[in-house]
Amino acid sequence: MVSRVFYGLLLALGIAAPAHAHHSFSAEFEADKTADLSGKIVQVWWNNPHIRYRLQVVGEGGTTEDWELQAASITAMQQLGWTQATIKVGDELTVSGQVGRNGAKKLYVRSIARPDGSRLMTGRGDATGPDPNQVHATPGKSYAYGATRNDYPVDISGPWRNRYKWRVTVDDLEPKPTPLSAEGRALFAATDHYQDPALRCLALGLPRLFGAPYNMEIVDAGTHYLIVYVEHNTPRRVWMDGRKPPPDTPPSSLGFSVGHWEGNALVIETTNLLPGWLDGSGLPMKGEGTRIVERYELAADHLSMDRIMTIYDPYYTQPLVRRRGSARDDSGVDIGEQAPCDPDSYYRDLLELGKLEQHLKGE
């Protein structure tokens, strides 16, 4: 690779957000503008909420510029076969991707070319291996751990792959346009991208956790289902014995969930939620008075399910709906512990934007 670098912004009409784009992709990057950069990797940050690299670019006059390259989370990239050694300090690369908003020297990586001609891809559609939107499972096979504890119509326990029918959790709620109330609209307008709790590695919680592409495991614990999400190693209990939340139950990011079966559908209702964001764009959730209803509708062969979430929140004049899917998988579903989230990149961004002092003062 030549050390002299040419980079140019290209209008790329019709390019969608990357399949593994992190929570705030739309707020940080221009989905319809791309750049091609060539240079040398001078720094690697292998941590969550997203992997980052620093690329040193040499211009026509010999001057250098540093660009920050961003990819998805460690878990998402590992699902595509990446490791910490995939890109190392000293590697010379040509990188293509979406550029940062407002002139920021950032690039969300779509593809990488090495000097030997080999390429690395970061998007689902570019990855090798089975199509994640197809079910790769065997009819009649048991995916549960041991005997079923309860006489439910369906045994939903075991591991599930959540990249099935997945989409980025930004601007994915229906209906459109978003039916914000006057209070909700004012709050949304005053929201800054850098207030995103996910960037600070805070618990994602509901309803955003529902939309994540990472795998989950469901365990029948008798009185309740225990749902373990790979995302931030998060456990969630869904009570199936009809209990109500105790009067002194504090609100939390996952709230208090109760469930029941309606035929082949597990129905979960959640209350007692903390205020938060509904998606990566910053749509607000009030928490107090918020009610979330989920339906996990199993297919006839029980190898996949459609998950539908309906959100009732005082900041909106109509219920909001989010749709995802889950599938069994014969090749195995990784439910191992996720690498811990590191907020270092969040504070670095605040420092570069001159907002760190403002943040520390709570302004």
Predicted regions and their residues:
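Signal peptide processing junction and immediate N-terminal pro/mature segment
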Residues: 19-21
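Bacterial N-terminal signal peptides
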Residues: 6-17
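PEST-like low-complexity, intrinsically disordered acidic/proline/serine-rich tracts
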Residues: 23-363
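Positively charged n-region of N-terminal signal peptides that target proteins for export
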Residues: 1-4
